[in-house]
Amino acid sequence: VKKKGLIVAIFFGTIMLTSLAAGVLLNNTPSPSENTEVTLTGTPADNFPDAQRAQFCGSGDAKSTTFVKEYTIPTVCTNPLAIVTDYNGNVWFAQTNTGKLAKFDPNTASFTEFDNPIWPKNGRSMMWGIDYSPDGSLWFTDESYDSVWKFSTQDEKYQRIGYPSEGDSLPQKLKVDGSQIVINDFTGNKITFLDPTQSNDNLRYLSLPSPVNGSVTGDFAIDTDNNVWYTNWVFQQGGILIKFDQEGYRNSVAIFSGTLSVLDYIEIFQLPFELLTPNGIAVSDGMIWLADTSSSSIFNFDPVTQQFTQYVTSDPKISTYGNSTGIIKSPISRPYWIEPNSAGQLVFNEQTANSIAILDPKSESLVEYMIPSKNPSWGDCAPDSDCGLAQIFDFAIHNDKIWFTEWVENNIGVVDTSIALPFGIELDSKDVSLVPGESKNLSFTISPQQDLSDVSLILSNPYNFLDVTSNVSDSFQLDPGVPSSMEVTITASDDAIPGKYKILLGAQIEDVSISKFATVTILP
């Protein structure tokens, strides 16, 4: 377990916005502290020294905004992570500091926590994957003990199943897919397909080895043709996108008596060099979407043209990182996991922007909801400031609600996307063409539906050969029903590379950011 913690820390240690407790993120025990005094409370907080309890167990009460409502888990310091909803809209989540599952009933706003009698005493594990099965059971992963767990909602009993591994393994995301359970083994470098219909503790399984040695295997998504898409990547060195034809493979196995190579049923696509940490992946309307946790970007892949398109988020608000010492020069949002909703929009969590975002590919719009709770231990925060991160590591979509967990604030929360947005954004033109060295202006209109103060512009652009500027640099106020036109200047440098690029234009208040993408074409 210690070896695994070190390996994972190497990959994820730089994902934190600051160096504060960076290596602790996926370890099973808290990091060494100068003050190791532990005041026993008889609660899960006892797994942390007194000096680290505010950092890992929560720094304040549950909060709300117009769009977000949080709920505090009754048991302190549970470190909630993987989350899912059942068919009745109940919310289920795994507690990494207790080994329990918990249920939240949105109708009564009540929690029920289910003791896990076979969980090791004082055990801790990152539980990244959870899904609900039609038979009323919940399946979830456990990286510390290389396990897959089944919880029956009928008899409220847990069953632990050893995860098939050779050497290091880290069962991460999990999906119930028809009659099988699919899991990515992050450090074991494979995708595993389990048959859950067996009653014993040793389930039949198929392991799909990854084609890149020394890499990790990221999240996966399944398209309408039952192809499995996933990533292999090497930390800070890039990687590949993989398509596995599982139907073709299984059909061949059924009719062929010899030995088949699973790798004969995969296609490989090189990831763009800008995409270094493709954690999350989703399929929507035939397109593949990837979340890059090393940047502020989401990438779209078109399987027909085999082209990638980069979509950038807004910059994190200063309330998420503080920058009281001035050490943070270029804050990034770090999109982590990504899932489609029923409308084909892409929902993703922005880890270091403390936000849940919705990208609409049809309207090319982006809405980012700020989560109100912030733990100052995870930012460069001044004393007594409203600053930091709640560490939103997972979410679940149910109708127009997005439920999420706050790993270091001991809360769950919900974004209500049915609530009307306070303003709209319209671009005068969605397309701009430039030759290298040229500048052009583009205008967009902000249409407020209510009084708005402390409004600021969003001018996001991930390319060092493009510059997007405006003469509006300070925050401003908007009156309801009075549209405001904003003009920006887009400049291509002399060495700009020909191609099509997306920039993000919009506005933000503290609770929500609303933007639209414009396409900039650099001509030869």
Give the predicted meaning of each segment.
Residues A382-P422:
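Blade-level signature of beta-propeller repeat domains, shared across WD40, Kelch, NHL, RCC1
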Residues F56-C57, T66-I73, D115-K121, G162-E166, ...:
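Surface-exposed loop and turn segments in beta-propeller and other repeat-based domains
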Residues V76-Y87, W119-P134, E166-G178, P211-D225, ...:
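Beta-rich, blade/repeat-based domains predominating
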Residues E37-F67:
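Blade/loop signatures of beta-propeller domains
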Residues V91-N97, F140-S144, I183-G188, V228-Q236, ...:
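Conserved beta-strand positions in repeat-built beta-propeller and related beta-rich domains
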Residues V1-L40, L505, P524:
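Secretory targeting signatures
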Residues D46-A51, T72-G99:
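Beta-strand-rich domains and repeat architectures in extracellular enzymes and scaffolds
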Residues I419-P524:
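Long beta-sheet-rich domains in secretory-pathway and surface-associated proteins
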